[in-house]
Amino acid sequence: MIQQKVLFISLVAVTLGLGLGLGLKESVQPQAQSWSCSKLRCGEKRIANVLCSCSDDCLEKKDCCTDYKSICKGETSWLKDKCASSGATQCPAGFEQSPLILFSMDGFRAGYLENWDSLMPNINKLKTCGTHAKYMRAVYPTKTFVNHYTIATGLYPESHGIIDNNIYDVNLNLNFSLSSSTARNPAWWGGQPIWHTATYQGLKAATYFWPGSEVKINGSYPTIFKNYNKSIPFEARVTEVLKWLDLPKAKRPDFLTLYIEEPDTTGHKYGPVSGEIIKALQMADRTLGMLMEGLKQRNLHNCVNLILLADHGMEEISCDRLEYMANYFNNVDFFMYEGPAPRIRSKNVPKDFYTFDSEGIVKNLTCRKPKQYFKAYLSKDLPKRLHYANNIRIDKVNLMVDQQWMAVRDKKFTRCKGGTHGYDNEFKSMQAIFLAHGPGFNEKNEVTSFENIEVYNLMCDLLKLKPAPNNGTHGSLNHLLKNPFYTPSPAKEQSSPLSCPFGPVPSPDVSGCKCSSITELEKVNQRLNLNNQAKTESEAHNLPYGRPQVLQNHSKYCLLHQAKYISAYSQDILMPLWSSYTIYRSTSTSVPPSASDCLRLDVRIPAAQSQTCSNYQPDLTITPGFLYPPNFNSSNFEQYDALITSNIVPMFKGFTRLWNYFHTTLIPKYARERNGLNVISGPIFDYNYDGHFDSYDTIKQHVNNTKIPIPTHYFVVLTSCENQINTPLNCLGPLKVLSFILPHRPDNSESCADTSPENLWVEERIQIHTARVRDVELLTGLNFYSGLKQPLPETLQLKTFLPIFVNPVN
């Protein structure tokens, strides 16, 4: 980072020096000067074909240059004004509701502003005076059309259909690209963009370029829109947006978009670390300054709500960092979308679309070399945090490429200089800016990062609209707003727990279970017979933030209380929906006992509703795993509380390597680092990979010869106190969360780990599969943190937080 900063400072000096020498200052360029006033132009006679006027009647004619008042009338510029106070909100007559401007600067990575805000005085003032996030997370793939349309709809790409800048749809038998006329076919564009939400509810919307806005989606366009033309100067775009705000009330738009291609165009050509990027950033900054000056000239600078954001970031690339498919296949006989987010499909479509050997391609790209700069996935196996599987347009073969690398067909590929984007949205280089200013937003406010799927709901709130269904979590950005329009309501539990009373000891012959080390079976079983006081104490210890609520209809389950853990045992799937426990910094672990050595039926569960040990035969690839690790108990005798069939779940033998190391090594490590953890874990069933829990009818279709359904994933939610002086049980302030959705697969080929020790790969693997608590909720039908006393919007912030583990390359 220090080297980067030194390089940039040098580039700044060179750039500014060249600027002075080569006449880059606007005051020297007649064309640039025509967009602004000067003392010489003040009071000028009207001239034909001038881009804006500095004549004495320009205010009356509404064609003044945006800086007319500051240059010709001696008023202070917006840039030199102090930040508006909370009492300074003002709108001129005729503006009963604040207009909303959504301004996108393409490819403006958050790191540009983090490091070089002093070079961008207008953007820096917006950041200082308004609300800003350290960064906004783009959706995957981090491409232009994908993210702009997600911002407009609040939908993941798999939901709105624009899954990349280049797409093939087998049902339409059409190809989509940015330059093709087919991109204007409404069949590509799903969801309800914000301009339609506005017009459907009586407002007017105007778009000066936005992907999708020139398409007749659902039979209509925005009230006003412009067909894309990249040759139109940025100043002309700003001028037109300001003219829209000058329209009579009956015609004036309430929602407006503005888009500029910089710094993306320059980033692609020269890369994100270059003197040219500095010029592009300063050009973008001047464009914002022109807009704010124009708003102030209309007394709208404290009336309009403005959101300034980007679609994605930018990463440096090199022709020395390419992975060639020709090095993995003798004959590259398939179609490949090349670059930082590659996909592979059949060349012969639609004929071979469904019969293409996607699994064979992934297998041939997995663990082929000691060091590969990509991982190959079937779309259904991609990290759930990406939400990139549930659409026929998403090809089944996907490559997740390392930072600064690209995967391509062969050496004919030449677009490998400068910069690009499209990578994993957790990479720091892909992070985008988010700034907001206006009477609707809090002042001088920095907020934690969030995902761009949340912006649609935020815009609806500012415009007092009811959002269309979307993937955002409504209310999670209320802390950005001065007076939140929407108040979220707590989820309502759909299925309450049943009773599973302590019963007689069943015959061991029923289960096939054995445990020769138990000499006093009745005494061991009586430990499961907790009285009400003991249950209350267990809940205080093991469920400090409330019991996970079941939002699935007609779910039959009961709560099982033990001293050191609590579980919700499902009679539908014959395993726990969840298990919850709390461990401390000092919790010690030992080698977990083998279930085949000691396991017995839970006397609280009728035999007909219980798993049996005979379900697990030695020749099967499935083995019983524990949700609550028995070795977390403090004595061998207490371990018997967990060596019961109600605590086991079916796991592939290969997966138990990851699961056991996670629980015996990593969870205790995290507990030491965070002064204790509350742990909730359980199974996930998502066979149709739509990101939502499967119905029980669907689950039953995937019962194999073990007679129990096999989960597609397992989740783990680790919660601690943000103030690590406190343990999870005495935490009065904000909470901190780490959550994971781990694919349940028969092998560990994702990590090329069949022979590697667990300490070399398990932690990296689980970090790849980090997730939001909200993702876990959607996949399980559970509602977490129901017992928190804090306002619900604060809980929603916690649920939508995504941990980041990726170390930046630059």
Curated annotation (Swiss-Prot):
EC number: 3.6.1.-
Localization annotation: Secreted
Glycosylation sites: 175, 218, 229, 364, 471, 553, 633, 704
Keyword annotations from UniProtKB, A to Z: Disulfide bond, Glycoprotein, Hemostasis impairing toxin, Hydrolase, Metal-binding, Platelet aggregation inhibiting toxin, Secreted, Signal, Toxin
Enzyme active site: 144 (amp-threonine intermediate)
Entry-linked Gene3D superfamilies: 4.10.410.20, Alkaline Phosphatase, subunit A, Extracellular Endonuclease, subunit A
Keyword Signal among record annotations: yes
Tissue specificity note: Expressed by venom gland.
Secretion signal span: 1-23
Main location as per UniProt: secreted
Binding site for a divalent metal cation 1: 264, 268, 421
Cofactor(s) annotated in UniProt: a divalent metal cation
Stated name of the protein: Venom phosphodiesterase 2
